[in-house]
Amino acid sequence: MKRRSFIKTSAAGLVAPTALVSNDSKPIKNRVRKPIVISTWNHGLPANYAAMAILRQNGSALDAVEVGVRVPEADPESQSVGYGGRHDKDGHVTLDACIMDSFGNAGAVAFLKDIKHPISVARKVMEQTDHVMLVGKGAKKFALAHGFEEENLLTKKARDEWLRWKEDHSIKDSW
């Protein structure tokens, strides 16, 4: 479900019951079907579909979140996270991710290089350490120790964009 549709439906669902109340009120059936997965942007819809597939098979919400986030992390066309993601000023793709379960346990990684699925590393941090967040070299060392593969995440397209940026970055931005 797209975010705008969800908000419109939810807002109507909140207002409508108050308009229908009378002296002989009867329970109003909740029309919201659960579970639901929403995205802010259209490029998030493939992640929603993957997450919903997990939920429809009675998988956990935590599994659905991880599987859903892995979709854009693996999509070089997304360029928001993961493989083919935006580079830093030195041409490195550095990634962050965090995840939380229904009990309030959390795991996160930041400034993680060369690991395609930081969401899965963040989950490992949550489930297998006493830490909430690992950063940089420590996060990468942890990921490699837990079987994650080192990969070059800078695609040709992203590298070409970085080279173009590098040529004129002082003129067009605040670096």
Region spans (language model):
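N-terminal secretory signal peptides and thylakoid transit peptides that target proteins
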Residues: 1-14
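Bimodal feature
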Residues: 2, 23-27
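Alpha/propeptide regions of enzymes that mature by internal proteolysis
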Residues: 10-11, 26-175
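Hydrophobic h-region of N-terminal signal peptides that target proteins for export
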Residues: 14-22
